[in-house]
């Protein structure tokens, strides 16, 4: 499957993803195709909508203490739902769909998420810190939200200005 990352301001990123009902070879092929894209772009998470598939599916591979992302750390979440959350944490986030822009975002520091794996098994997972942040970031994509939507008015204006400048620079080579 030949996939490309959808970049802001593409309207596809604003689509609300649909619940996955068929846990079949098409879903498996999509998940298998997403992983190398995420890893080759130095990502830690990727939602299906970011490769133009509006399905409630995402993948994560959080770096370990040594900064490594071994394949066995891959987590695939289908139809994830937050069931519990607490605390706050501010972290500088970036996004494969909003390249070269990073900004502080406030999120829950501890979460519990219920989801299904690629074989429709139900799983409950507790996460904290960067892992919790990444899950929330990717889950936002499933609802058509980007991390820049969480910025204050002034920070959002700063982003829009920087984004326009970057686009202009890109055109002028």
Q: Which residues fall in each region the model found?
A:
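Positively charged
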Residues: 1-173
């Amino acid at each position: 499957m030949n996939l490309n990352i959808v970049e802001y301001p593409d309207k596809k990123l604003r689509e609300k993803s649909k619940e996955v009902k068929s846990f079949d070879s098409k879903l498996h092929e999509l998940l298998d195709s997403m992983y190398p894209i995420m890893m080759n772009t130095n990502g830690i998470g990727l939602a299906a909508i970011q490769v133009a598939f509006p399905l409630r599916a995402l993948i994560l591979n959080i770096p370990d203490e040594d900064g490594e992302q071994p394949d066995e750390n891959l987590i695939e979440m289908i139809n994830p739902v937050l069931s519990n959350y607490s605390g706050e944490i501010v972290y500088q986030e970036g996004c494969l769909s909003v390249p070269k822009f990073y900004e502080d975002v406030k999120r829950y520091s501890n979460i519990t998420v219920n989801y299904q794996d690629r074989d429709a098994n139900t799983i409950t997972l507790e996460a904290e810190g960067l892992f919790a942040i990444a899950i929330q970031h990717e889950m936002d994509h499933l609802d058509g939200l980007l991390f820049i939507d969480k910025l204050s008015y002034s920070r959002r204006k700063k982003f829009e200005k920087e984004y326009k400048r970057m686009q202009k620079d890109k055109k002028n080579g």
